[in-house]
């Protein structure tokens, strides 16, 4: 991903909608500290939002991002966003062991998150990469997890 052009595009797009964005550029570790802190904690630097790269490994991960018991600093609901109906759906999904039924519940939860939009999704990473022609054996994964064991240099 290319953070600077992505953020510049975001800033221009939001400005067209009447939002004035300023960025507080910080070192990655400082951003993670802010993300793992409460929104009003000093580590969050008084910002209203975080632009952080997160990956979804499973639809059930919605619980840690949006359930009201998942507020930071103990979990990952940094914005402390909540809605009782979503809490109910996510709790049902946690307690349902039939995969088909759980999928139906998570689909409802997903639809609610899409409609309510607690986050703005910035990018769908299609793995842009640049490398030397001397690198051989590299096959980009369609995820954040990359296997480097097959790479050689010629």
Q: What kind of feature is each model-predicted range?
A:
Residues 36-45, 64-95, 124-154:
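Short, solvent-exposed loop/beta-turn-alpha elements that line the ligand-binding surface or hinge
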Residues 5-9, 16, 30, 34, ...:
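Extracytoplasmic/secreted proteins, especially bacterial periplasmic and envelope-associated proteins
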Residues 1-12, 146:
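Bilobed "Venus flytrap"/periplasmic-binding protein-like clamshell domains
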Residues 13-68, 105:
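Periplasmic binding protein-like
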Residues 1, 29-30, 127-129:
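Short, internal active-site loops enriched in acidic
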Residues 1, 50, 81:
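A short glycine-/small-residue-rich loop at the edge of a beta-strand within enzyme catalytic domains
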């Amino acid at each position: 991903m290319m953070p600077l052009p992505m953020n510049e595009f975001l800033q221009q797009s939001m400005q067209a909608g009447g939002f004035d964005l300023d960025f507080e550029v910080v070192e990655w570790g400082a951003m993670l500290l802010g993300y793992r802190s409460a929104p009003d904690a000093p580590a969050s630097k008084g910002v209203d939002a975080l632009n952080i790269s997160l990956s979804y490994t499973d639809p059930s991960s919605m619980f840690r991002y949006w359930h009201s018991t998942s507020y930071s600093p103990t979990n990952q609901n940094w914005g402390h966003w909540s809605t009782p109906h979503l809490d109910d759906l996510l709790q049902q999904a946690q307690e349902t062991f039939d995969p088909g039924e759980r999928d139906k519940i998570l689909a409802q939860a997903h639809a609610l998150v899409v409609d309510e939009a607690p986050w703005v999704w910035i990018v769908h990473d299609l793995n842009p990469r640049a490398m030397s022609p001397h690198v051989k054996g590299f096959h980009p994964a369609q995820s954040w997890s990359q296997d480097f064991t097959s790479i050689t240099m010629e």
